Amino acid sequence: ANEPKDELRINFCIDPIIKSLSVKGTCGCKENERNCFDVIAELVKATAEYKRVKVVNVSGATFSNAGSTIVEELAFTLSAAHEYLVKLMEKGLTIDEVARKIRFTFAVTANYFLEMAKFRAARMLWANIVKAYNPSKDCSMKMVAHAVTSTWNQTVYDPYVNMLRGTTEAMSAAIAGVHSLEVLPFDYSFEAATEFSKRIARNSQLLLKHESHFDQVVDPAGGSYYVEVLTVSIAEQAWKLFNEVEDNGGFLAQLEAGEIQKAVNASGVKRHTDVARRKEILLGTNQYPNFTETALEKIDKAGCCCCCSEGEEGGVEALKFDRAGSEFEDLRLATERSGK
């Protein structure tokens, strides 16, 4: 209660467009949709004096964890965020009031340099979108980005490799300049996190902060020719896809038509094929697997966090969630069950 208004930090993490509609498939009732935006608009007004309080959290990680490409994740996330801008301004709010209450969550994968470039491109494109509405303050064009390590490339077999993936992903996000970061425990995909796995996840971030000092350098990747070229390339491709979505009625229209899901699910199928053909490498799964390892006994169904999607009757089609190594793991688990 005594916290200064400029210092109070709260994230409501409300996201009826992506999190509720893409994961649960509940976009069947227009009345519910209107009520959601009415509630969000009231929260934006109520927290207007609290600069660091965020109301909307645009969950772009949802697309990445369903197997989308980096370009699709960025374009669809920005399109959903634009939908929030439009819907909330229709409620009488200004661009400055709305934009400053939006936070983004992106997944960060093991594509080290591409992930750095993705966050840099995201900030550039979001600034362009907000600028088009003539905000009165430049700070309204600033993107607040949260990163969470990927679930797509986590594996059940050789799970300690997940520690390496998480560290690499955390490093990409830190160098890219995210505002906050979540490193998932290495056993996230097959059991409820243990004290050990949670401690390792926390310490990965602390090492990057206290030993590598990534929090003390502004844009360490800035000026790198390779990263700058990647940034421009990703920005151009994402902007093109963003405009295609907008030209066809916007994110909600494309979601209800099933076009967003179709694109993301197709990318997921292609990536599974790439893993099967070893064009996309998963160490310990399709490259250098330990065939003496067994995993059946360590899978805790109650604690499993596989991001299984579900659709609801009358709603839109939900995204299909899976992990890159799931098909390999299914074969090995079936072999274990057979006792051979």
Describe each region flagged by the PLM.
Residues 17-22, 62-68, 91, 95, ...:
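Flexible loop/turn segments at secondary-structure boundaries
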Residues 1-109, 133, 142-146, 174, ...:
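Catalytic alpha/beta active-site cores
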Residues 68-74, 109-121, 150-163, 191-201, ...:
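Short glycine/threonine-rich loop-to-helix capping motif typified by GTGT followed
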Residues 1-3, 14, 27-45, 158-164, ...:
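Phosphate/diphosphate-binding loops
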Residues 43-44, 48-87, 167-242:
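Mobile "lid/hinge" segments at catalytic clefts and subdomain interfaces of large enzymes
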